[in-house]
Amino acid sequence: MIIRCSNCSGALVYDIALGKMKCAHCNAFFEVDEVETSAFEEDMMEYNIFACTACGAKVAVNNVECATWCAYCGQPTIVFERVSKRKKPKKIIPFRVTKEEAEAVIRKHLKMGFFVPKAVKEFEVERLNGVYMPYWLFDVEYKDRPFFEVKRRNGHYKYQVCATTNFKNLTMDASENFSNLYSQRLEPYDMKELTDFKEEYLSGFYADCFDVNKEQLREKVFERCKKMYDNEISKNNLGSNCHSTTPKWKVLEEKYAMLPVWFLTMRYKDKSYTMLVNGQTKKVMGAVPYVKWKVVVVYLLVLAVLLLIVPGLSCKWFQYAADNGNWILMFGIVFGVVVSFLAFFMGEIMRTGVNRDICHTSGRKITRLNEIRQEVDE
């Protein structure tokens, strides 16, 4: 549905920087609440559904837009499929990050990557699309009576704790195309900015199709609540082993919402790679190429430290420890050297996104990673 300007009847689009509706024809600005909304107060709203013939993803746009590039794989293989009426979301977090800011934060992120090729750090943007991703938000009451095992010098003890926790706006993505790995790494969103849904916010952006029912997510909701509950209880108790008994939980409220994500597609050596940016917090994730020889060199350096330097230091410090009885200091220094090298090595690999399973290429369908969602928010 086209949202018209009351001055000239031109199409209105949502301006991220100002948080207002802007007329593309006369450049007039309107507050979101000022725009006439009587035409779409129903529980359903109409979308144009476009499907990608390369990866199978589907996106929904309003009648103002015409999708020609796939936001997921970056290929110009997207075609109109049908007009569809879909459930209207109750809540939305509008885009706070502009297109320019999204590109800038990705460039900054890649420049910090030691293993990232120079050509990738100086990439040219192929596609940069703003997409509202569908989520289910759950309010959950969870209670349990876990018991803990505590070992002391004078014995082995058990004690029990009873506590109730309320989880507010627990996020679960509602798109088959949007893998759990993507959604977990883009979180958390600041739910204080959650607002009532208005169709005006969709103007100028894509929206992913909602295709996962809330009933399908209930088991994952329970698992996530249990993990967070057990972790929090363990932090506040002395026991090292937390044993759940018979947890009770109930969903107090379920809300369908849309959360903002920027999809940036770049090409390197005839392959497409996609980087994602949280449209509210600027958090970045994605997979990019890496320089293999740098990985090999760092690996060999770490190996050299482990095989040559550390044993040498160990011998000297063992002798020092034997003479002075300060073996704790020796162990701490050796351990610190090893951990520092390993932390640098693994940190750079994670920053670069070496995981090839989430690289998008032109000749293959997007793979949904069958990984368990991280249950604890970062």
Model-based region annotation:
Residues 2-3, 20, 45-49, 67:
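Residues immediately within or flanking Cys/His clusters that coordinate Zn2+
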Residues 9-11, 29, 58, 76:
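Cys/His-rich metal-chelating microdomains
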Residues 83-272, 293, 297-298, 319, ...:
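Charged, low-complexity helical/coil segments in non-catalytic cytosolic or luminal regions
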Residues 14-15, 32-33, 61-62, 79-80:
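Short, non-ligating residues that shape and space the ligands of small metal-coordination modules
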Residues 337-351:
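Alpha-helical transmembrane segments
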Residues 5-8, 23-26, 52-55, 70-73:
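Short cysteine-rich clusters marking metal-coordination/redox-active sites
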Residues 298-315, 335-338:
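Canonical alpha-helical transmembrane segments of integral membrane proteins
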Residues 268-291:
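Juxtamembrane amphipathic/hinge helix adjacent to a transmembrane helix
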